[in-house]
Amino acid sequence: MLNKDANGFQDLDPQYSFISKVHIIASKIKPEDDEKLHSILDESDIRDWESRKGLAKVLQFMERSWIETHKNLRALISKERPDFIFGDLLDQQACVDMRNEFNIPMAIHFGQMPFHLAPAKYIPGLPGFQQRYLTSEHASIWGRISEDFFALGLVFSLRHHFRWRKQMRDQAGAAPLAFSRKPDSLILVNTFFGFEPPKELPPLLVPVGPILSDNYSPLTPELESFLSTHKNVLYIAFGSHINLTGGSRFTKLFDGINSAIQSGFIDGVVWTLKPPKTSSSSSNPLPNFDPKFYHITPFAPQRAILAHPSTTLFLSHCGASSINEALFHGVPILGLPIYNDQFKYALCIENVGVGLKMDKTDFEAKEVHQKIGRMTTEPSFQQDSKRMMGIARIAARRKHLAADLIEEELLDHEGRFSLSSKSDVRHRRPPHLQTASARMSWFRAGNYDIYLVYALVLGSAWWIGKTILGTGIKLAMGKWLR
């Protein structure tokens, strides 16, 4: 809802006129810090122990903003007293703190299923960070074990970060964060089952994606002309933070794409490509793109391109928004994930048959050529993309469900509490979407107390029966011996 300007994301988008005021609760990131952090992410490899140290630094930098956010948000809420808090994953800590302190209903938005909530035994490893298997269905026992060991190693490598976070909160006088396997507030997830592996969910954890605008920017005249004169166009975009200009990755992509053009798999390329950095442009100049086959632009109306019938393939970093848009418009995806949740989405596109993925650390031009060839000639990719497009377009209506659930939470919260004074807050009812198991111990919720009683009764009956039978046999044997 905010427009980006030279001073940060602080200008209201005019189409959201219902927003009356914006409060800035944290400082914007400096451009040099932003570039440094994304450079670390670009070169990181979550499989490598040393590389994880860099990821921990990025995570620590991002979470350090909690200090300022918590302070300013607390002052704002003390003064304004909002009726509802709707936060993002990155601001979850501060939002939870405010909810607990001021007793305000809350919802949190996640881009993918939270790895720590509603775990399923048939989903191996750490959900969202799996290396090969999204579920145990087709995984060997060793594959499942390897996913578990990878998850343990990942958590262990972040142990210092968890300790640092606790110290940061302790120094600020904040209450410890409670860990729960079930949500205690509304969680809205921008995904949908069919793309995300299905699993059982508690009522407070709701997939409401793909969340997409009903309107989007149209094609420019130049793009319209290019797409209308080509039949099989490859669209390439790597988001707003990843810069592939220069370096070996760019060279491999460019060589592989040229080979695909020469083989007739594609006849055009629309490439959203940022200008190279001044420091590297002399040593790694961009090649001369043949305008017959290439349309290069620093910015492109992505949804309009994906919606065009000439767009037959999308080469993407597998960011959440790009994946949702490609699924909605039925375009197969060749994924080159770079960091974070992009690896999970790359696994998902292969799992549902709408794409293939490449490894950023060891892919070659030959692989780019071969996979473009497969995806443009094998009908299964188009068929599965069409299937997922239908599912995604129906699922996209659930953004209205998200709004309804927020309204439900607000009304339920107002009715559940009796406020006789500022210091007297009494619960009248539990949250209407919270399962009873979330308010019970694992022992009681799992009926283990009942199982224990059954075991004691059966064990006692077995012991009594054994004792009576043994006594009877001894008496009978005594009489027989006489």
UniProtKB/Swiss-Prot annotation:
Enzyme Commission number(s) of this protein: 2.4.1.-
TM stretches of this protein: 450-470
Main subcellular location: membrane
Enzyme type, top EC level: transferase
Alphabetical UniProt keywords: Glycoprotein, Glycosyltransferase, Membrane, Transferase, Transmembrane, Transmembrane helix
Keyword Transmembrane helix included in the entry's annotation: yes
InterPro entries attached to this UniProt entry: UDP-glycosyltransferase, UDP_glucos_trans, UDP_glycos_trans_CS
Pathway in which this enzyme or protein is active: Secondary metabolite biosynthesis
GO cellular component: membrane
SUPFAM superfamilies: UDP-Glycosyltransferase/glycogen phosphorylase
Glycosylation positions in this chain: 243
Reaction(s) catalysed (UniProt annotation): exophillate aglycone + UDP-alpha-D-glucose = exophillate + UDP + H(+)
Gene3D superfamilies assigned to the protein according to its UniProt record, in alphabetical order: Glycogen Phosphorylase B
Organism domain of life: Eukaryota
Subcellular location: Membrane
Effect of residue 62 to F: Reduces the catalytic activity and does not lead to the ability to perform C-glycosylation
Pfam families, A to Z: UDPGT
Entry's family note: Belongs to the glycosyltransferase 28 family.
Functional summary from the UniProt entry: Acts as a depside 2-O-glucosyltransferase that catalyzes the first glycosylation step during phaeomoniecin D biosynthesis by producing the intermediate exophillic acid which is further O-galactosylated into phaeomoniecin D by the C-galactosyltransferase OGT2.
Protein name: UDP-glycosyltransferase 1
Species this protein is from: Phaeomoniella chlamydospora
